[in-house]
């Protein structure tokens, strides 16, 4: 029996930073979906959706320049789930010194977010023309130990996510951010690792549940 292949593209939150493969949201999603599905994790720690340069130097850590990005396209998946943007919502501020690294000041180039994200979408469409594509809205940034990551920057990207979705009516939204935000603040804080940026196993399970409900709304409703 041919399995439905789901390819998860993203950053460290997809990869499973700090928790290991079996606690990552793609792994937990595979458990929810069952044997008829194959879920492939192609997340890369620190990656940005934007692929930019400044004075000939690469800014951030562009996902499209990573080997796992090329592997994700080569998978020819039936479904692609893209969860990027957390690392684009940063200003490059040093954690100790009063200094901003311009090569990490991604939010200063936020007006280029849409075109760069669209390039990823177009590459997926070219690699897998019949695939369904889902865009995830990233989880909130809590009181992050790294000063450069701030929720207000993620909020600045929200209109751009809306613009991307409006320009691509065939793409569906998975609102991970809303899934966290609708909980009480204490409950939300309990879903993160100590760094305030990366969800812990419980938070990653919430992401998996949210993705599952988007992919399989009927089955999820029956389980509820």
Model-derived segments and spans:
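N-terminal hydrophobic signal/anchor transmembrane helix of membrane proteins
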Residues: 69-88, 168-194, 204, 211
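Generic structural signal for well-ordered alpha-helices
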Residues: 69, 117-122, 158, 162
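A short helix->loop->beta-strand "cap" motif at the edges of active sites that frequently abuts
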Residues: 128-132
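Short acidic/His/Gly/Ser-rich catalytic and metal-binding motifs that mark active-site loops
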Residues: 48-51, 89-94, 143-145, 181-188
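Short hydrophobic segments within beta-strands
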Residues: 9-10, 136
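Substrate-gating cap/lid alpha-helix
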Residues: 139-178
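Histidine-centered active-site loop/cap adjacent to the catalytic His
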Residues: 29-32, 191-224
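Conserved SGNH/GDSL esterase-like catalytic core that processes O-acyl groups on lipids
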Residues: 3-7, 13-111, 115
